[in-house]
A protein has these predicted regions:
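Ferredoxin-type iron-sulfur electron-transfer modules and their immediate structural context
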Residues: 21-34, 39, 98-135
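Short helix-coil boundary/hinge micro-motifs
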Residues: 10-36, 40-42, 181-193, 202-204
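Short microdomains enriched in Cys/His and/or Lys/Arg
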Residues: 96-116, 152-168, 185-200, 246-249
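Intrinsically disordered, low-complexity serine/proline/glycine/threonine-rich regulatory regions
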Residues: 35, 240-249
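Hydrophobic, ordered structural segments
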Residues: 75, 81-82, 90-99
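Iron-sulfur cluster-binding cysteine motifs and their immediate structural context
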Residues: 82-92, 132-150, 163-177, 232-243
Length: 249
């Protein structure tokens, strides 16, 4: 269990008795409160070119947690006890400075609109800096940005599913541009360790900066765990860069 040297912030979301939130610590790990931890891996479908998440075993956090159940996840990518922090950020001189923008997804999003031949509308919002490059937005030689502009209802249905699988929440969708809320999939409240990739945080858990201010609460976000993202604390796909070559081993 790492010695953080400072108190956790107040940003939190309450689900029953659990305070489900994540604190980004200064140049250190993520302090995770009230969230179960599991493993996920990407399973490609060679026939269709699509992919999906396959849930692996839950991760026991009891040996890493303090008396209150808080556990610490590695953020520098150097831990020898991944996904947990082992203090390597100190010896590695990890610079975990947060560079992500603080505006809301809607305020920052590029908006694309489409309508099927049957008159069913669809709106896709896209915030590129949040993209974790997981690849759910491309399949069968096409992509979300082209599919939304067509009028084929089956293509639109496939596109909606692709958007719903976006792990970073860079892509969202709605039926109308003036809809009060996006149409979000129902996701479990948890943190998922994605094989050789990001932490996928779902279900509306809040994430707070090391200065105590909260980022916008989202249904799904991807947090960097390789230490190389240029959009910290969020994943930008740097783990897949050959110069980073992040692995769980």
């Amino acid at each position: 269990m790492p010695h953080l040297g400072h108190s956790t912030c107040l940003a939190q979301r309450v689900y029953g008795e659990a305070m489900a939130h994540i604190d980004v610590t200064r140049n250190g790990p993520y302090a995770v409160h009230g969230l179960p931890l599991i493993r996920l891996r990407l399973q490609p479908d060679d026939a269709s070119g699509s992919q999906d998440w396959v849930e692996r075993a839950p991760i026991d956090t009891s040996g890493e947690a303090d008396a209150g159940g808080t556990y610490w996840l590695c953020r520098c990518g150097q831990s020898q006890n991944k996904p947990f922090c082992d203090g390597s950020h100190r010896t590695a001189g990890f610079d975990g400075t947060e560079t992500a923008a603080r505006g809301t997804h809607r305020a920052r999003a590029k908006v694309m609109e489409g309508e099927s031949a049957e008159g069913v509308g669809v709106v896709v919002r896209d915030v590129r800096p949040l993209c974790a490059h997981a690849g759910f937005c491309v399949a069968d030689g096409s992509d979300v940005w082209h599919m939304v502009r067509g009028d084929d209802s089956e293509v639109h249905a496939a596109m909606r599913d692709m958007v719903d699988h976006c792990p970073s929440g860079a892509l969202t969708r709605a039926g109308r541009p003036d809809a009060a809320h996006d149409d979000e999939p129902r996701l479990p409240l948890r943190v998922a360790v994605c094989d050789n990739a990001q932490y996928l945080v779902t279900g509306g858990a809040s994430v707070a900066s090391d200065d105590g201010t909260a980022y916008e609460v989202r249904n799904r976000v991807s947090l960097c765990r390789c230490g190389a993202s240029k959009n910290k604390p969020f994943c930008d796909g740097s783990h897949a860069d050959p110069d980073v070559a992040f692995t769980d081993s």
